[in-house]
């Protein structure tokens, strides 16, 4: 069994600095670094993966479009969507990239089935689906056996922005969310369902769970640039003086 830290960020996070924080964490981690999973919701943003093609962005409008270094094509992130960023040591977990993706899909599907939603993965396309509608997108990057990026699970959100793109590069792909099957639904309830399944399926001990109501945990050297980019430079300075 391996240790893991779960961080739950309690406010909407802009994409760019969060992405840079993941890159920095991954570049500086070592074999003894504890794995981390970050739970959060993003401010509205389209992200274009490494395989992304411009023709799949139909009309981004006023929503920012950021080209990122995860796998896959274009998708949307926004409030009401649960992001799980998986900063894991795949070598330590004994997982190939393919098995890693399948374990994510199976875990998400298992959690949705607990809500009575008949979700499952597809052999032909990463992610989790209910019938032919996509409810969870997966986009990852693995460097030297360390993963970052993760999954986006649609919980209770405005799905309209997905109509401005071909989600994940598939023209006409319909998106769905937990709220379409279980209403009302609370984000915290979804987390309470999915966390134990991730721990079980990935072989983790009971985690240290950090509820981050501020960005003070980002004072650590490997995340200081993230803190500053989010306008927390003054908070960091004050924390060091106290």
UniProtKB/Swiss-Prot annotation:
UniProt-annotated binding residues for substrate: 70-77, 137-139, 150-152
UniProt-annotated catalytic positions: 168 (acyl-thioester intermediate)
Record-linked CDD domains: LipB
Keywords: Acyltransferase, Cytoplasm, Transferase
Gene3D superfamilies xref list: Bira Bifunctional Protein, Domain 2
Annotated ranges, domain BPL/LPL catalytic: 31-206
Gene Ontology cellular-component annotations: cytoplasm
Acyltransferase listed as a keyword: yes
Other observations noted: In the reaction, the free carboxyl group of octanoic acid is attached via an amide linkage to the epsilon-amino group of a specific lysine residue of lipoyl domains of lipoate-dependent enzymes.
Task performed by this protein: Catalyzes the transfer of endogenously produced octanoic acid from octanoyl-acyl-carrier-protein onto the lipoyl domains of lipoate-dependent enzymes. Lipoyl-ACP can also act as a substrate although octanoyl-ACP is likely to be the physiological substrate.
Family: Belongs to the LipB family.
Protein name per UniProt: Octanoyltransferase
Organism: Coxiella burnetii (strain RSA 331 / Henzerling II)
């Amino acid at each position: 069994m391996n240790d893991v830290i779960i961080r739950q960020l309690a406010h909407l996070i802009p994409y760019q600095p969060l992405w840079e924080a993941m890159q920095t964490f991954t570049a500086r981690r070592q074999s003894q670094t504890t794995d981390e999973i970050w739970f959060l919701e993003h401010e509205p943003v389209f992200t274009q993966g490494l395989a992304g093609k411009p023709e799949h962005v139909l009309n981004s409008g006023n929503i920012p479009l950021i080209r990122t270094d995860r796998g896959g094509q274009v998708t949307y992130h926004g409030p009401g969507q649960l992001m799980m960023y998986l900063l894991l040591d795949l070598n330590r977990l004994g997982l190939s990239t393919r098995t890693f993706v399948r374990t994510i899909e199976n875990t998400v599907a298992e959690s949705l089935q607990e809500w009575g939603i008949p979700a499952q993965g597809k052999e032909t396309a990463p992610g989790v689906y209910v019938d032919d509608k996509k409810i969870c997108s997966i986009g990852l990057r693995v460097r030297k056996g360390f993963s970052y990026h993760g999954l986006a699970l649609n919980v209770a959100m405005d799905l309209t922005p997905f109509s401005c793109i071909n989600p994940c590069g598939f023209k006409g792909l319909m998106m769905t969310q937990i709220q379409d099957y279980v209403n009302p639904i609370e984000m915290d309830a979804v987390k309470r369902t999915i966390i134990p399944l991730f721990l079980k399926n990935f072989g983790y001990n009971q985690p240290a769970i950090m509820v981050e109501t501020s960005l003070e945990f980002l004072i650590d050297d490997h995340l200081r640039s993230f803190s500053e980019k989010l306008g927390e430079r003054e908070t960091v300075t004050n924390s060091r003086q106290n």
